[in-house]
Curated annotation (Swiss-Prot):
Organism whose genome encodes this protein: Cereibacter sphaeroides (strain ATCC 17029 / ATH 2.4.9)
Localization: Cytoplasm
Entry annotation: catalytic residues: 44
Pfam families listed in its UniProt record: NAD_kinase, NAD_kinase_C
Stored Gene3D superfamilies: Probable inorganic polyphosphate/atp-NAD kinase, domain 1, Probable inorganic polyphosphate/atp-NAD kinase, domain 2
Family: Belongs to the NAD kinase family.
EC annotation from Swiss-Prot or TrEMBL: 2.7.1.23
NCBIfam families: PRK04761.1
Enzyme class: transferase
GO CC terms, sorted: cytoplasm
Keywords, comma-separated and alphabetical: ATP-binding, Cytoplasm, Kinase, NAD, NADP, Nucleotide-binding, Transferase
Catalytic activity: NAD(+) + ATP = ADP + NADP(+) + H(+)
Name listed for the protein in its UniProt record: NAD kinase
Amino acid sequence: MTPQRIGFVASSAPVAQEALNVMAARYGQCPLPEADAIVALGGDGFMLQTLHETQSLDIPVYGMNRGTVGFLMNGYAEDGLRERLAEAEEEILNPLAMTAVTGAGEVFHRIAINEVSLLRAGPQAAWLKISVDGKVRMEELVCDGALVCTPAGSTAYNYSAHGPILPIGADVLALTAIAPFRPRRWRGALLPKTALVRFDVIDAQKRPVMADADGRSVRDVVSVEIRTEPAVRHRLLFDPGHGLEERLIREQFV
């Protein structure tokens, strides 16, 4: 079925705002809750923001690249948008759920589509204890940080930290160390998608750590739990032959 009601959103970048004016004038602007499809104009950062802000609507989101990074975006063109939406392939993503506890006892819940990362927040290296499904797997990881990512997020920060690119259909998560000092050669692990990963910060006052879920940070954490959230799903639309699986393969040969 060809979507008739389209809701457009755009980043604050001038090129994205210009595209918003052009596309809304040409195809009409529908309130997002009433739309058949949402079109996000910007880069990957804005796409993540849009997915977070619209996750309760269960409406597919089609990105058009008007930013600097476009891994999650389709090419921008003013013509034939309804036809492209009708022919698009849909990918369903389940995000990560993060529960972070601070030294003051505050509890923060965040959703992350790409990754949850723990990063040292001072000059001292972070000391982390890692547990998986209630069993301690590493008593002490000395590092700049660590992250857990989804397959969709494996080409982002995870890949920059020398983590593996995961097939989009794989029921696994990547746990990747960021600049590990001890164990020096330990890079991380592949875990089942159902795993509950827990990080406990050792000597948190001397070695402060922050947790970050897709750019939303919590400072001075003492523990962080991460798991897949099956109750939340994000629907992404891609042009035929340019879905996430193809993009993940292509990224490895750049």
